[in-house]
C-alpha cells in the first residue's frame, strides 16, 4: 500500500495529525481487510501513541473517524457482516515496568473512590493473568449449547461471518459439554496456528510450488478468511477461549478465573499458562516468568494480558471509548521495527564465508538497540530487493541474530544504491570466489586471512591433522590476540619463555606443548594436506591425493583436469583445491612450513594410473579350475586391469569366470543372471573386448 504523502513535522500539529490518521488507516486496511500487513506492529503502535498524545494536547484535532476512536478495520467483501451483541474491544498497551505500576495504581485508586472508604488504602488488587496470542480474535455464539455462528472482530462493532470455516477447527466444540448450558453464550477467543503446524503447512506449500506464509499469524488469518471452507479444513488451525460477550440463561461467574475454569468444564479449549496474582509486583513476576519460557512455547505470543479478576470490580471500573479500564496488554519488546539502512558491508567468517551485513540507524527492537543486522548472502539481498538508503524492517527474536526482513519500497529514495559483492576479501585482499550451486561466497585467503586465522590454526592442530596435543582453542585465542601467531608456520617458532607467560599456562604445560610441536614436525603427506583446511578436502580425499601424486609439489601445480583424475575427486573439490593453491598467500605459508627444521614427511613416486579398460571398477568372481591359468595368475591379471576380485557372488557381481568343478558359485550366478565366462572369455575381457 503506497504511502506517498509527505511526512509533516511535529511543528505542524494539524497536518501531522492528518498524516498520522492516514498512515494508520492505510495500515488498518492492509492488516484487517487485505490480510497483507505492510507495517510492523511496533511502528503502528508508535504512530498510534503519537496520534493519541497529539489529540490529548490538541482536543480540537480529534475527528470521528480517527483510528483512536475505534478498534480496527472494516469488514471485508465476500463475507456477511455480523453485528456483535457486545462490542469486541481491543486493549490498551503497556511496555515498561512503569506502565504496569501506573496501571495498577489507576485501578486501585479508581476502586477506592467507588467504595465507602474513598481514597483509603486498600488490599492489593487481584488480577487474572493470561498470554497474549499472536493470532486472530473471533467470537463464537452458542445457543442452547450448540455452535451456531462465528464472527471476526472486524471494527469491534461489526465483523465477518466465518461460521463455516470455524466449523473446520477441530479444537472448537460444536456442542458444549454438560447438562446445564446457557441459552446464549458468546465466547471470545483467538484463532492461531502452532509453530509445528505452521512449519508443516509451509512444507506442503513448497511441495505444491505455492506461496509460503510469512509467519503463523498471517497463515491463521489467511486460512480463516478463505471463501472456500474446504481450504480452511486443510489448514491446521487452533483456538483458545479467553473472554465473554453475551451470557443469557445463567448467572455470570464472579471472577474471570472462574469464567475460564467454567469454559474448561464446557469443553472449550483454554490455555493453561494463566495465574491469579495480586498487585503490580505479582503482574511483573508473571510477565518475567512467561518471558523466560516464551521461545519454548509451541505457539507465538507477543505479550501477556492482565484483567481485574472480580467481575463486580470490572463493572465499577467500566470502559473508555476504545478499551476496558480493567484490563491491559503488557507487550514484549517489539520483535520487528523500522529503521534506515545506511550501508552494506561484508563480514568474513571463521571459515571464509562472506556475509553481507546491514549497517543501520540505531533502533530498539527485541529488547536491545540494534545497529547491525545480517543479510545472509548475496542471493537474499537480491531476492528481497534491499538497497542502501532503504527504510527496512528489522527483526530480532530472543537471542537470534538480528536480520533485515525486507524493505518498504514505497519509501525508497531516488538515490538508493544496489549492493555489489566485492571481488576481494576486505580483510586480506585475497580473491572472493563463489562456487557453482552454492549460496555463500568465500575468501580464498585460507591460511593467510586474519579473519580465518583461529579456525585455521585449530584445524591444523587437531588430532587427525598435525595432532598438536595441548594446543586448544583458548591457547590459540591468546596466541592470536597477542599477535604471537599469524599462520600455522609461526607455531613452530614459539619458545618456552613465550608460552610460559601465557595466562593460566604453567611451565609444565609450556614444556608439554613444546614437546608436542616437536613431535608434530614428523607427519605424513595426507595429514599435512588435511591440516591445511582446504574447503571440501576431508581425510579420505587427502589420503587419495597423497597416494595419487606421491608428493606435495605436483598437487600444488596440478591443473583441474589432473586433479579430476584422483579417485573420488569431483569438479567442486578440484576447483576448491585449484583455487587454494593458486593463492600466493597460501603457497607462502606452505613454503614456511616446509622450511628446514619445520614440518617433514616421507614422499614417494606417484601411483600408477588407474586402468581405464572395460574391467575398470568391475567386480569379478573366480570359481573352479581354469585350463591354463592358476587362480592367482588370473587374479593378478584382473586387478592389473582395474577389476576387483571378490570371493562370493552377489547382485553387485559383474562377471563370474568359471572353470571345471565350479560348484555353488556358478549356480548362484546363473540364478541371478550374472554373465558367466570361460578362460577364453576372460582373455577377451583382458584384451578390452566385451564378450
UniProtKB/Swiss-Prot annotation:
Residues that, per the record, bind NAD(+): 41-45, 90-91, 130, 153, 190, 307, 331
Listed GO cellular component terms?
cytosol
Q: Which cofactor does it need?
A: Mg(2+); Mn(2+)
Annotated residues that bind Zn(2+) are located at 425, 428, 443, 449
Entry keywords, A to Z? DNA damage, DNA repair, DNA replication, Ligase, Magnesium, Manganese, Metal-binding, NAD, Zinc
Q: Which InterPro entries match?
A: BRCT_dom, BRCT_dom_sf, DisA/LigA_HHH, DNA_ligase, DNA_ligase_AS, DNA_ligase_CS, DNAligase_adenylation, DNAligase_N
Catalytic residues per the record? 132
A single MF term (Gene Ontology): DNA ligase (NAD+) activity
Disulfide pairs here are: none
Q: Does the keyword Manganese apply?
A: yes
Q: Where is the BRCT domain?
A: 610-691
Q: Which Pfam families match?
A: BRCT, DNA_ligase_aden, DNA_ligase_OB, DNA_ligase_ZBD, HHH_2, HHH_5, Nlig-Ia
Per the entry, what this protein does is: DNA ligase that catalyzes the formation of phosphodiester linkages between 5'-phosphoryl and 3'-hydroxyl groups in double-stranded DNA using NAD as a coenzyme and as the energy source for the reaction. It is essential for DNA replication and repair of damaged DNA.
* NCBIfam families associated with the record: dnlj (TIGR00575), PRK07956.1 (NF005932)
User: Which protein is depicted?
Assistant: DNA ligase
Amino acid at each position: 500500500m503506497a504511502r506517498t504523502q509527505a511526512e509533516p513535522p511535529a511543528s505542524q500539529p494539524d497536518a501531522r495529525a492528518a498524516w498520522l490518521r492516514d498512515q494508520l488507516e492505510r495500515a488498518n486496511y492492509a492488516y484487517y481487510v487485505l490480510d497483507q500487513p505492510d507495517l510492523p506492529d511496533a511502528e503502528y503502535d508508535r504512530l498510534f501513541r503519537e496520534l493519541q498524545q497529539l489529540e490529548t494536547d490538541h482536543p480540537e484535532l480529534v475527528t470521528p473517524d480517527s483510528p483512536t476512536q475505534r478498534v480496527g478495520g472494516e469488514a471485508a467483501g465476500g463475507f456477511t457482516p455480523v453485528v456483535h451483541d457486545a462490542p469486541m474491544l481491543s486493549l490498551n498497551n503497556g511496555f515498561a515496568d512503569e506502565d504496569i505500576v501506573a496501571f495498577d495504581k489507576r485501578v486501585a485508586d479508581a476502586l477506592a473512590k467507588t467504595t465507602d472508604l474513598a481514597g483509603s488504602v486498600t488490599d492489593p488488587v487481584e488480577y487474572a493473568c493470561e498470554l497474549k496470542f499472536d493470532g486472530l480474535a473471533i467470537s463464537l455464539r452458542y445457543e442452547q449449547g450448540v455452535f451456531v455462528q462465528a464472527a471476526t472482530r472486524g471494527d469491534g462493532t461489526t465483523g465477518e461471518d466465518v461460521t463455516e470455516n470455524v466449523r473446520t477447527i477441530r479444537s472448537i466444540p460444536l456442542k458444549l459439554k454438560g447438562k446445564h448450558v446457557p441459552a446464549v453464550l458468546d465466547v471470545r477467543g483467538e484463532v492461531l496456528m502452532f509453530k509445528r503446524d505452521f512449519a508443516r503447512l509451509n512444507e506442503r506449500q513448497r511441495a505444491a510450488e505455492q506461496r509460503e506464509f510469512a509467519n503463523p499469524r498471517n497463515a491463521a488469518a489467511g486460512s480463516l478468511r478463505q471463501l472456500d471452507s474446504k481450504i480452511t479444513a486443510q489448514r491446521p488451525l487452533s483456538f483458545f477461549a479467553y473472554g465473554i460477550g453475551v451470557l443469557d440463561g445463567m448467572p455470570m461467574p464472579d471472577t474471570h478465573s472462574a469464567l475460564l475454569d467454567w469454559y474448561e468444564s464446557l469443553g472449550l479449549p483454554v490455555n493453561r499458562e494463566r495465574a491469579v496474582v495480586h498487585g503490580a509486583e505479582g503482574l511483573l513476576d508473571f510477565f518475567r516468568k512467561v518471558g523466560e519460557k516464551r521461545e519454548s512455547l509451541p505457539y507465538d505470543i507477543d505479550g501477556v494480558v492482565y484483567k481485574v479478576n472480580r467481575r463486580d470490580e470490572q463493572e465499577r471500573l467500566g470502559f473508555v471509548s476504545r478499551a476496558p479500564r480493567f484490563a491491559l496488554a503488557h507487550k514484549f519488546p517489539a520483535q520487528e521495527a523500522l529503521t534506515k539502512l545506511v550501508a552494506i558491508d561484508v563480514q568474513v567468517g571463521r571459515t571464509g564465508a562472506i556475509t553481507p551485513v546491514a549497517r543501520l540507524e540505531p533502533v530498539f527492537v527485541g529488547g536491545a538497540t540494534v545497529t547491525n543486522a545480517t543479510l545472509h548472502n548475496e542471493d537474499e539481498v537480491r531476492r528481497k530487493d534491499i538497497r542502501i538508503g532503504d527504510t527496512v524492517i528489522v527483526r530480532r527474536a530472543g537471542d537470534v541474530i538480528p536480520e533485515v526482513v525486507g524493505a518498504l519500497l514505497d519509501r525508497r529514495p531516488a538515490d538508493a544504491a544496489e549492493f555489489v559483492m566485492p571481488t576481494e576479501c576486505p580483510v586480506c585482499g585475497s580473491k572472493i570466489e563463489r562456487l557453482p550451486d552454492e549460496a555463500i561466497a568465500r575468501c580464498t585467503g585460507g591460511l593467510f586471512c586474519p579473519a580465518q586465522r583461529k579456525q585455521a590454526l585449530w584445524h591444523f592442530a587437531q588430532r587427525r591433522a598435525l595432532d598438536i596435543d595441548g594446543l586448544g582453542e583458548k591457547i590459540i585465542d591468546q596466541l592470536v590476540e597477542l599477535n604471537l601467531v599469524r599462520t600455522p608456520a609461526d607455531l613452530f617458532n614459539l619458545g618456552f619463555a613465550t608460552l610460559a607467560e601465557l595466562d593460566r599456562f604453567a611451565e609444565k604445560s609450556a614444556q608439554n606443548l613444546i614437546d608436542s610441536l616437536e613431535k608434530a614436525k614428523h607427519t605424513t603427506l595426507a595429514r599435512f594436506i588435511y591440516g591445511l583446511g582446504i574447503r571440501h578436502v576431508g581425510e579420505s580425499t587427502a589420503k587419495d591425493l597423497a597416494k595419487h601424486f606421491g608428493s606435495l609439489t605436483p598437487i600444488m601445480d596440478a591443473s583441474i583436469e589432473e586433479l579430476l583424475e584422483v579417485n573420488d575427486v569431483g569438479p567442486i573439490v578440484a576447483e576448491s583445491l585449484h583455487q587454494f593453491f593458486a593463492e600466493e598467500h597460501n603457497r607462502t605459508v606452505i613454503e614456511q612450513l616446509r622450511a628446514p627444521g619445520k614440518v617433514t614427511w616421507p614422499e614417494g613416486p606417484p601411483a600408477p594410473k588407474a586402468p581405464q579398460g572395460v574391467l575398470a571398477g568391475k567386480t569379478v568372481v573366480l570359481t573352479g579350475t581354469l585350463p591354463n591359468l592358476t587362480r592367482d595368475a588370473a587374479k593378478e591379471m584382473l586387478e592389473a586391469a582395474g577389476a576387483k576380485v571378490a570371493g562370493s557372488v552377489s547382485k553387485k557381481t559383474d562377471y563370474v569366470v568359471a572353470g571345471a568343478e565350479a560348484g555353488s558359485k556358478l549356480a548362484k550366478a546363473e540364478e541371478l543372471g550374472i554373465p558367466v565366462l570361460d578362460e577364453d572369455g576372460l582373455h577377451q575381457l583382458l584384451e578390452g573386448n566385451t564378450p
